[in-house]
Amino acid sequence: MENNKKLTLCEIPNAFIQFFNNKDYENKSKLFNNTETDQWWVSGDKNVYPFAGSDSIQKRLDGFQTLQNGYDKYSMTLIDQIIDHERRIMLVVGKTVSMGFGMTKEYSNEYAFIISVNEDGKICAIKEYFDPSAYLKMAQSTPSLQGIFKNFFPDSFAPTSRD
């Protein structure tokens, strides 16, 4: 993808998935509008799931990159997409599979992203829905991930024995 090529709405879902599969963080400006000010909201109760709520897209990308760097195996697959051309929003459904950090079994989860795109063809807001309890269980059962969580959420992450 060329730097100045404007993505069409139909190209964005696959570009979003491939951005993470290719770990293309250095070229984030090709896909995202302003990662410092634009927001990425994640579902869940922040009192239970410290990663829930709104943060800058950049903070979400930083956390994701840290996780990806520790995975021995990672993939995200596009499952479905719905695009509203008039409102410039889309629903992107993907499935991730990952293994690493000394995990004893593979982690897999489905994610639904509602993505807003500006007139320049750049992602300017994201809402993410998934099963946060599956993610938290995986993190709490993996000691090296507990350390990463404590770095990103120092005041709110405390391992528990939830089932």
Swiss-Prot record:
Superkingdom of origin organism: Eukaryota
Family: Belongs to the UPF0523 family.
Name of the protein in its database record: UPF0523 protein B
